[in-house]
């Protein structure tokens, strides 16, 4: 599911590279990259189906959250919404849900029980959000050789990430000095 979501994300972001190599959409075009992502989603679903109906439902809810997060990111926050809270919810839905599900699957399949699965799911979501924040900082602060991606992709695509949102918040409050710090 994660790899499939990356194929789709690269189409949405018009990203030419992923992990230091040309992205699927760059190599094959948008239509083929989307279809390849769909095939990967289907294969992941087949694997999860062998785990039983409870896991299939959990996987489906994760896929739904992932898509809702992408839609919300695409549409942006409603008027008056806190943009940082909105951003963090998008991260929780897109990246956090995937890590959360992987963690809860591990707990459930190891026999740890639903209480422990819930605890590791919550932790996994936080890890996913933290990972995405770090990735967003790298998009601004690292070279393509370091990150394996084209720097500044989010800025070019008009996606407000946490560093940009916090800078705008400071600008609105008048707390940025002449050097921009």
Q: Residue ranges of each PLM-predicted region?
A:
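Mg2+-dependent prenyl diphosphate-binding active-site environment of isoprenoid biosynthetic enzymes
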Residues: 1-177
């Amino acid at each position: 599911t994660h790899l499939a979501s990356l194929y789709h994300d690269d189409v949405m972001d018009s990203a030419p590279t992923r992990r230091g190599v040309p992205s699927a959409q760059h190599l094959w075009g948008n239509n083929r990259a989307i279809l390849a992502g769909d095939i990967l989603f289907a294969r992941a679903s087949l694997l999860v189906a062998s785990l039983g109906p409870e896991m299939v439902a959990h996987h489906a809810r994760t896929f739904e959250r992932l898509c809702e997060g992408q839609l919300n990111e695409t549409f942006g926050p409603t008027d008056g919404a806190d943009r940082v809270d909105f951003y963090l919810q998008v991260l929780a839905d897109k990246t956090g849900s995937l890590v959360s599900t992987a963690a809860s699957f591990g707990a459930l399949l190891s026999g740890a029980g639903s209480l422990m699965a819930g605890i590791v799911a919550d932790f996994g979501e936080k890890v996913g959000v933290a990972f995405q924040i770090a990735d967003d900082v790298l998009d601004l602060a690292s070279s393509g050789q370091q990150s394996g991606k084209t720097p500044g992709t989010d800025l070019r695509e008009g996606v407000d990430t946490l560093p940009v949102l916090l800078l705008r918040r400071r600008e609105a409050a008048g707390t940025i000095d002449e050097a921009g710090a």
